[in-house]
Swiss-Prot record:
Involved in the binding of tRNA to the ribosomes. This is Small ribosomal subunit protein uS10. Keywords: Ribonucleoprotein, Ribosomal protein. Gene3D superfamilies: Ribosomal protein S10 domain. It comes from the Bacteria. Belongs to the universal ribosomal protein uS10 family. GO terms for cellular component: ribonucleoprotein complex; ribosome. GO terms for biological process: translation. Part of the 30S ribosomal subunit. One of its GO terms (molecular function) is tRNA binding. Pfam families: Ribosomal_S10 (PF00338).
């Protein structure tokens, strides 16, 4: 039997370490409530590259490149309870992690 009660939690961050720590804290909170969990599933890293001139006046060939990497994780929670939702909303996550919760 397939149930339609599912919560999808997506995590975004520029730092992999705090992203994995946040995912583990969410997994521990879900395991305490005895709900089924799928994940954390690593999603493809989005890389934005910026090229700028090193000198404002001359040396067009001299350039510098910067990149910004956005790491993502996906966690599916099957058959969530209202107590689990309250604990997820009250969960303290480090700064720099964006959380997107959808049903």
């Amino acid at each position: 039997m397939i149930t339609k009660d599912k919560i999808r939690v997506r995590l975004f961050s520029f730092d992999v370490k705090i992203l994995d720590q946040s995912a583990e804290s969410i997994v521990r909170a879900v395991q305490k409530s005895k709900a089924q969990i799928k994940g954390p599933i690593p999603l493809p890293t989005k890389i934005k590259k910026y090229t700028v001139l090193r000198s404002p006046h001359v040396n067009k060939k001299s350039r510098e490149q910067f990149e910004m990497r956005t790491h993502k994780r996906l966690i599916d929670i099957l058959e969530p309870t209202s107590a689990l939702m309250d604990s997820l909303m009250k969960l303290e996550l480090p700064a720099g992690v964006e959380v997107d919760i959808k049903q």
